[in-house]
Amino acid sequence: VSPSRHRHPLWTRAFHGFNLVVFLVMAASGLQIYNAHPVFGGRGGATVPELFTLGGWLAGGRDWHFGFMGLCALNLGLWIALLIQRRRDRLAQSSDLATLNASSNLARRRLAAHRLIYTLMLVLLAFALMTGLAMYKPAQFWWLSGLFSFGELFGATSWHTLRVAHLATIPAIAFLTLAHATLSWRVGGWRLWRSMLA
């Protein structure tokens, strides 16, 4: 490695790789479960192409999904621990929105954007885990399931509302991941990406 070439610490690269693998497996296996009974349109509704699913059928998708659920919880725990340890650098603050809107300092605006992304990602991961647990063990986590009974006001069962909310975390997390990668590219280009990959 060239002395001038910056590399992120091994744990940072490993954590990013771990995050990506867990998300891809959870998303693909979740879409396989979705295909067994689509949220929109029931059994005759639109399905996701097999290319983007994992498991081959409902039971296979469930095996992958529930198998990685523990890793997802571990991931969330590590995320919380890291953010608490470095909360001043990573968690969004009340001034960050104002910085995005008013600051002419590009570096400060990018830092504020990163803080917002990290914080929103933490909220989304927690939300995905909570809605997943509410569907996995509805009797044990009845109080979580009950939070989604508001869907009945719009003619939907709380179970359907829960499924829609859980499914929505996939594109939301994917969007934040893309935003994080794009912002990192704008900050350091290929050099910064390479320092994370190898």
Predicted regions and their residues:
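Membrane-embedded alpha-helical bundles that constitute the cytochrome b-like, heme-associated redox core
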Residues: 1-198
